[in-house]
Amino acid sequence: MILPGGFLLLVLLAAASTSQIVWAAEKSAKLATVRIGYVSRSILDMPYIIARDRGFFREEGLEPELIFMKAAQTIPAMLAGGIDFGSATGTGIAAAVSGVDVRLIFALTDRPSFDLIAVPSITSVQQLRGKKLGTSGVGSLAEILARQILIANKIPLEQVTFLPFGTSDVTYVALKAGTIDATMLQIPQKFFAVDEGFRNLASGADVYRAVMGGLTTTKNTINDRPELVSKTIRATMRAVRLVKNDKNYVLGFMKGPHLDLSGERARFAERVYDATMQLYLSSHTVDETLQREMIAIASQRVKPAQPVPPERVFDFSFVQKVTATLR
């Protein structure tokens, strides 16, 4: 039977459409889910969002799920299998030093962007005696930095009340509400605070070098799913490369909904970008000297029974392998 030309065309179009749907479904079914718990709406977690939006994860065969959570929640979530990776590096290092079987596998920066910001009436670190200081959580990088600043200024830690609030945007709200007297704020919140009249008392980078921003995961994930680790790192590194090489794209991204840049995104975007370029590492690893320094600082609080070697906390082997193949 000979079909009319118009009807035949409709049949062919329907068949082609069906084939495309089936092909797309099969492709989607082949993607492996990767769940990343990220802890800030800042430049430290920007690469994961860019990697998702630009399709870098999907090009690695991964379907990303980015889950916003508190720093203290990342380790329990990883151990329970709720997420594969966490971006709270300070929390991850403290957990590893305490004996939890996790590793830091990717470093975004090696200098903290946190500054100690206080209410306008406090003009020096010495005036924090008897005051309330908000941090993101017990053992977090923000808390470690705050403690190091107090120690450097010879203030006994017991003379300051530490209150865990969660992410920087939450502690910033608490600072503005007068619930706390000071807190550690990172980019971009520290820019907002200073512009609004709050005091910048000290820089975390002046007292402490540390990995800030990056990825942690469990030893089981490293052993059982090495391809997932490599692909996640490769997608992230591609996003970092894009950030460094395409300023116009990143400025547009910063003016979108993903970063916490208050209501004046256009005014802050370029300022934040310039600060980002000064912080992002090229190697995404840190040397053994810094690794041991970070372990020593974490050990002051965690107090492990035995000395902790760097390989018990850090594993940059995947970054090194990906770097060798990424062009």
Named regions from a protein language model:
Residues 45, 75, 79, 143, ...:
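Extracytoplasmic/secreted envelope proteins and their assembly/folding machinery
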Residues 295-327:
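Conserved C-terminal helix/tail region of periplasmic/extracytoplasmic solute-binding proteins
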Residues 91, 169-260:
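Pocket-lining segment of extracytoplasmic ligand-binding domains
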